[in-house]
Amino acid sequence: MKKKLALILAATMMVGALAGCGGGTTSTTESDPGTSQGETASNLRVGVFYYNYADAYISTVRTAMDAELESLGVEYQNFDAQTNQATQTDQINTAITDGYNLLVVNVVENASPDAAQNVVNAAKAQNIPVIFFNRDFDVSVLESYAESCAFVGTDPAEAGHMQGQAIGEYLVANYDTVDLNGDGKISYVMFKGQEGNPEAEYRTQYGVEDANAVLEEAGKPALEFYDSSNTQKYLVDQTGAWSAQAATDYMNTILGQYNDGNNNMVELVIANNDSMAEGAISALQSVGYNVEGGDKTIPVYGVDALASAVEKIDAGIMTGSVKQDGEAMAATIATLVGNVQSGAALMDNTDQYTLATNDAGETIPNKILVPYSLYSAEG
């Protein structure tokens, strides 16, 4: 089912001075003086630290988060690390010094737990609660500050599994059409957002593995990476920004050698996110593929179900995406912020959410998972 979500802005926003290297927004709204308890709007100061404003998905989270925090009536400031962990660390340390008493952190580096642990150590020294979101890391960080630290995100493997299953089912149903050169195999390119990021690693792995499992069950050969000399079987954004431009540049280079004229056109695009999927589409359109109303289309899959990607899917330009619900993530974070504001425990009022489990199947009490859903033209 196609899901369309809307947010109603509950308060007006006053834009203040830029903060840190990336800048930010301070927003203060009046709360009902007769109902606030605990950390009210007068003394709760929330620092929200984003790894990169330019990330299209993060932009949706930020818009929704601003609305949620305004609705709560808290003072907050946004900070943009611009994919630089040192910048973010400086922003957080300065915010603590400046009196911010709740940190909401989209950590830049998560290939190891070090950056997140440093945030926790700094916050714990001042008894400041921390809410991490979106970019996952080792659970030991949460355990080190269990009563005052939480994570809101997604199951890193789920999007890869959903994407791979959808790709496999689509190919089985449309195999001869997708097999442009009629060689009985499907060639693909995989665009990876970042090295070491759990979401990127699992999406890169399962987007192909699960598709191959469906193909094998249907008696079809496994997918073949278009460039047999590439042993990694993916192309990564070297900046770690999951950017459309990286995919466009890669795809333009690919099309110079792998094309209709050489009878070896890439037949499938798999991307870790919608931005990279859309970047690949830009390059494809330059050679007449994936144009609305055109007669030459190769399947392109992404993750996030951004509004721009949904439009492309509806128009037949893109094939499918896995929705990562930015509005739901922001609303979940706002529940935790509201707990701090009212003086409740950080994880109070969360019975409606899904908690993560560890490898032993034990519940992780301060790690909330926001579910994914598939978006495709088929519904």
Language-model segments: which ranges?
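Flexible loop/hinge segments that line or gate small-molecule binding clefts
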Residues: 119-158, 162, 174-185, 191, ...
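Beta-alpha junction/loop-to-helix N-cap segments that form part of ligand/metal-binding clefts
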Residues: 82-142, 149-156, 274-277
